């Protein structure tokens, strides 16, 4: 998982013919070469131990004093003296100026987004219309039935992406998770201080109304989820249990769901809840998927799913029959809940193309498209109708095992900056321009109601929120204010608001604010002509939209 080192034990292997000294007609190893091979063997052993997370290197007092100590965990989530996430501030992720969109040209997702944003069939000049021009057309009765369609509403809102910091809450330790409920009325935040905070988001507010002390927490809460009815939430940590707790009411009732793992040190890095609230899905550091049935109150499945930590799980749609998993083996797997068996753990397909471990997966909600974030510093868009070949899976596995750096505390190697496409890569699109360091950074599709899911947004190790255009692959917005990596991001399902959760201990709410000048919206050539002190921002003008169902 994000915790495990990426180094490879086999990266320093030698060909059988290397190191042989040819003397006369025979082949013998010289003493010097034997000693050299001995050193190589030790290096291989050290690389293996580092990759498995059983030991780690720490900086001593001297500039060149490196110490080898036994690791307390084999995950990214370590003790409080671990790296605080600020190294990534010095890393400037390279932006892909010319994303490869060829695979999207004839894929159905282009039509879907075009319909959802009112762009399908429009000429280039119409696509470039400003918001006032769209209003003018509506007033002239040129819109459908005299008002904006749902697609046109989404296109209007693309002019008002969040760009201004409107609220900050500060914690004493790192913020790990932060998500909106399905109806957008509650925001839930989980911090390393073992406290889960709930915020009331109704009527434009963002007011904390409850703080709950999590139980049985090892180092930090790692993931959270709401139940479909919105009355309870779940959280996971370094523990054998996933806990469920009530949101409303005076007291806090914590129920422990025992997964009964085989590992002594066990963590659930990712959780998801089925649409009927009955089953809880978890991905763990033992390479297994766990399914817990709340009605039977027992674990019903333990599936050996990945060769390394399972960092991400997600249901494909509201049917909860198709699910996704991703791990440190760089493979995303697709499972059918109806055919999952412990004695025959076979996925229905796999998606390969990443070159390092997967940190997060988000489904578009249509049981077809998903995105995955990875330690190879990319997001990939997938179509489950395009599974990868055996060649693609082997290429991804090999690339992942050959990584020889630790993303928790080392800088990104320059080779990761190159636009390399592995053989058999079946992804539709690759997005570059954000950093994935230190922790399992999340990425998500933008909401369907307000944006038509035309954007992908992600946290970043440099303390930013990065928003990509799904179809073009270009960055359309960067929100910058944090001093450490942004681990989680969440977009309000019906409003233009984004909340970022960072390792600098801050929770930040971003909204659109209109002003005469905004540097992010201005060409760099015009920057110098803008005064440093601009006019006071004013709220976005209200636009009539249909209410959410």
Swiss-Prot record:
Residues 1-40 are annotated as: Disordered. One of its GO terms (cellular component) is nucleoplasm. The modification Phosphoserine is found at residues 73, 75. Keywords: Phosphoprotein, Repeat, Ubl conjugation pathway, WD repeat. Transmembrane segments: none annotated. It comes from the Eukaryota. Pathway: Protein modification; protein ubiquitination. WD repeats lie at residues 170-210, 216-258, 263-302, 305-345, 353-392, 435-480, 481-520. InterPro entries: DCAF (IPR051859), DCAF11/LEC14B (IPR017399), G-protein_beta_WD-40_rep (IPR020472), WD40/YVTN_repeat-like_dom_sf (IPR015943), WD40_repeat_dom_sf (IPR036322), WD40_rpt (IPR001680). Disulfide bonds: none annotated. GO terms for biological process: cognition; exploration behavior; gene expression; memory; protein stabilization; protein ubiquitination; respiratory system process; response to oxidative stress. The keyword GTP-binding does not apply. It holds the Pfam family WD40. Residues 1-24 have a biased composition (Low complexity). May function as a substrate receptor for CUL4-DDB1 E3 ubiquitin-protein ligase complex. This is DDB1- and CUL4-associated factor 11. It comes from Mus musculus (Mouse). The gene is Dcaf11.
